[in-house]
Curated annotation (Swiss-Prot):
The keyword DNA repair does not apply. Its EC number is 5.4.2.7. One of its GO terms (biological process) is 2-deoxyribose 1-phosphate catabolic process. One of its GO terms (molecular function) is manganese ion binding. Mn(2+) 1 binds at D10, D344, H345. Signal peptide: none annotated. Pathway: Carbohydrate degradation; 2-deoxy-D-ribose 1-phosphate degradation; D-glyceraldehyde 3-phosphate and acetaldehyde from 2-deoxy-alpha-D-ribose 1-phosphate: step 1/2. The keyword Transmembrane does not apply. Its main location: cytoplasm. CDD domains: PPM (cd16009). Its cofactor is Mn(2+). This is Phosphopentomutase. It catalyses: 2-deoxy-alpha-D-ribose 1-phosphate = 2-deoxy-D-ribose 5-phosphate; alpha-D-ribose 1-phosphate = D-ribose 5-phosphate.
Length: 404
């Protein structure tokens, strides 16, 4: 029985990539800087001491990062019995965003330029927002700027509740984000507004509209809920997910994967929120998955809760939780199963600002006859998609080289 399990540690980069200068990210290193902070006692909130990831280390994380940066991260070294194949991959795509990373690893790199709202204030064209408001029956909106999602709730959440005006904001990514209170504005109304916005954005080539629902009674206790929804463009070509689907296989999305691929190629969507629930759901789906199935999970908390919020201790604690549960996954794998752990970009919690960082991503692979050892530097995330195509004996993808 052949299956592939992809565990996407969203934003878990392993060092600045060769083209990082073009993004202002030279020196960024999500994994390395977390390990360094832990070793120096600077990440002892909710956890303490050096970063402890013994299972990821056995799969080759420390070695992959060493090959990426030229040095082992603090607390990681050669004194580990490797069980997995490891490498690090350069992104071909033009951006360092979520859709680009996901699409590329499924065999479809983004070789065009996304549209962006580059102005930090008055970010959105008036003709665009006028059309959105008219169609939605709204008389105004708040925000219209680049912002951190948590900060903008503190600044504008109470005014939003009083006025009923949605909060529009963006970032360095190709994204239009809309924050609304689940109770006072209504979740269905937010989703309808996002669907309208997605349609009106067609001429602008914006990658995603993101619904950002929140709850709470005031600025001191506003919090995002688990009902986020992404409205992505569809990939410009068939991904390996589509090809397996067309060949009669199954593709199970856990978390936000289905949204990122605009449901293309997805046969089942499983909703889960938080690291524990996402891991539980992934294990449950692997237990029930049959032959010719991909189970694909995005562990978004690493990015949304820890990377963007520059929470080093939280990121470290999340990684240690994830690592502690990996033996549960390994115990479910058959000899023909392929497990891949990777990331879609970096988001160094020690870096300036709140945006993603252009980094190499780890490629940790286990099973399917792979021998423990180095896969080297992969020229594209698409090597993952090509390897999956090879594993299932599908028609080769246009991009990528298989490491199987």
């Amino acid at each position: 029985m052949k299956r592939t399990i992809i565990m996407m540690l969203d934003s878990f980069g392993v060092g600045a990539s060769a083209d990082a200068a073009s993004f202002g990210d030279v020196g960024s290193d999500t994994f390395g800087h977390i390990a360094k902070a832990c070793a120096e006692g600077k990440a002892d909130i909710g956890r303490e001491g050096p970063l402890k990831l013994p299972n990821l280390a056995r799969l080759g994380l420390g070695h992959a990062a060493m090959e990426s940066t030229g040095a082992f991260a603090p607390g990681f070294g050669d004194n580990v019995e490797l069980i997995g194949a490891y490498g690090h991959a350069q992104e071909l795509s033009s951006g360092k965003d979520t859709p680009s990373g996901h699409w590329e690893m499924a065999g479809v790199p983004v070789l065009f330029e996304w549209g962006y709202f580059s102005e930090h204030q008055n970010s959105f064209p008036k003709e665009l927002t006028d059309k959105i408001l008219a169609r939605a029956g709204l008389d105004g909106f708040l925000g219209n700027c680049h912002a951190s999602g948590t900060t903008i709730l503190e600044e504008l959440g109470e005014e939003h509740m009083r006025s009923g005006k949605p909060i529009f904001y963006t970032s360095a990514d190709s994204v239009f984000q809309i924050a609304c209170h689940e109770e006072t504005f209504g979740l269905d109304n937010l989703y309808r507004l996002c669907a309208i916005t997605r349609e009106e954005l067609e001429p602008y080539n914006i990658g995603r509209v993101i619904a950002r629902p929140f709850d709470g009674t005031g600025s001191s206790d506003f919090a995002r809920t688990g009902n986020r929804k992404d409205y992505s463009l569809a990939p410009p070509a068939k991904t390996v997910l589509d090809k397996l689907n067309e060949a009669g296989g199954e593709v199970v999305s856990v978390g936000k994967i289905a949204d990122i691929y605009a449901y293309c190629g997805i046969t089942k969507k499983v909703k889960a929120n938080g690291l524990e629930a996402l891991f539980d759901a992934t294990l449950a789906e692997v237990k029930s998955a049959g032959d010719n199935t991909i189970v694909f999970t995005n562990f978004v908390d690493f990015d949304s809760h820890y990377g963007h919020r520059r929470d080093v201790a939280g990121y470290a604690k999340g990684l240690e939780y994830f690592d502690a549960r990996l033996p549960e996954m390994l115990a479910l794998l058959g000899e023909d199963d392929l497990l891949i752990l990777t990331a879609d970009h970096g988001c160094d919690p020690t870096w300036q600002g709140t945006d993603h960082t252009r980094e190499y991503v780890p490629v940790l692979a286990f099973g399917a006859g792979l021998k423990a050892g180095s896969l080297g530097r992969r020229k594209s995330f698409a090597d993952i998609g090509q390897s999956i195509a090879s594993h299932f004996k599908l028609e080769p993808m246009a991009y990528g080289e298989s490491f199987l």
